[in-house]
Structure formats: structure tokens, C-alpha cells
Amino acid sequence: WQVRVEDDGRALTCWKQRFNQDPAYRGDRTALTTLWSHHLVKRPENQLTGVGFLHGGYHLSHGQYMDGSGAFTVHRPEHWVFSNTKLQVNDEFGGKDTIVGYECDGCEIEWREGLPYPTGNDGTPTNFHILATASAKWHPDDSDWYDAWQPGREGCAVMGLYQQGGTVFTVGTTDWSHGLAKLNGTVDIVTKNIIDKLAF
């Protein structure tokens, strides 16, 4: 959420879903305190992280995908992120620990020859590598306040990375840490690969 500092620095304000009640709605709409990716703000978090909530949604939460696996499906197992995991194309991982859950961030995807690619239309860098995905969906009520979205629109959690000066890696889910309890489990190995590659 985009917030605004007010009251001489003593308060942070965010109108969130009630953005049309924000005083900025009648003036400089780029200062609206709502989603960064809202079409009136036009500063999608995808430009920084590669993913955002607009093309994500919920998984095992808010009544969406309540029978979901809680797992990611692998699309590019040859990537160094998956080194030492033995994962193959279309394998799932993390379901036993429900690593995909609650809020999920994604990006607009197009499929070419069986592989997902970012369209770049939502601010996601076109050199973003989509490594794994999981189904996600907005709650129908969310579409009531965000008029640019159709109710029932499907999204996904997206795990991936891109380089622009440095490397930005994202797992696109709030519940990734659930998989870290198992020493040498897949999530633990992937996390170690990332730290080993990017820490030095």
C-alpha cells in the first residue's frame, strides 16, 4: 500500500480500499493512499519486486483455493535456484508445509512453448525469469472496490528473479517460511542456494 506521512510526521495515512474518500482523490491522484499498482497511482510494485498483488491473490485464504495444494509448480528446474533439489518440470514442492498461502503476488503471464514469461504490461521487467507458480485468486469483494478488475479473475503466486544492477529474487507468497523448518528440505535448499549465490 502507498501511504502518506501526515500530522508533521506523526501519522501514516492509508485509505486502502476507500481510496475515493482520500482527499488526494480530488487532487493529485498519484498521491492516493491505495495499492501502488492501482491504475490511478501507476507505480506498481512489480517495477521493484517483479510481482504484485494485482496479478496474484489468495491461496488457502479468504475462501480462495481452500482445497489448494499450498505448493509451487516448477517450470525451469535447470535454474541455479533449484540446484541440488532434483526437481523436474511440473514437479510440486512445499505443499506439505503449505508454503503458498494467504496473500500471493504475481505478474501478468503469457505462455510460450509450455513456459511462462512476463508480458511486462504490469511493470514487471521483461527479463524477469518465472521459475515456479501456484494458483491464486482475488476475493470477489476485492473487485468491488478495484473497478479495473473483473470478479473471478485468476492470478498466481510467482517465484522468480531478474537482474537490474543487482539481483532481485521473490517467492510471491507470505508463507514461504513455513518450509524452512525441515533441514535439507526443498525450501531450505532453495533458500540456501539463494543466500550462497547472492551473499558474496
What are these regions (language model features)?
Residues 38, 45-53, 57-58, 63-68:
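Non-catalytic, alpha-helical, charged scaffold/linker segments
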Residues 1-42:
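Catalytic or ion-translocation cores adjacent to nucleophile or general acid/base/metal-coordination motifs
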Residues 1-13, 61, 66-200:
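Extracellular ligand-binding/catalytic regions of CAZymes and related secreted enzymes
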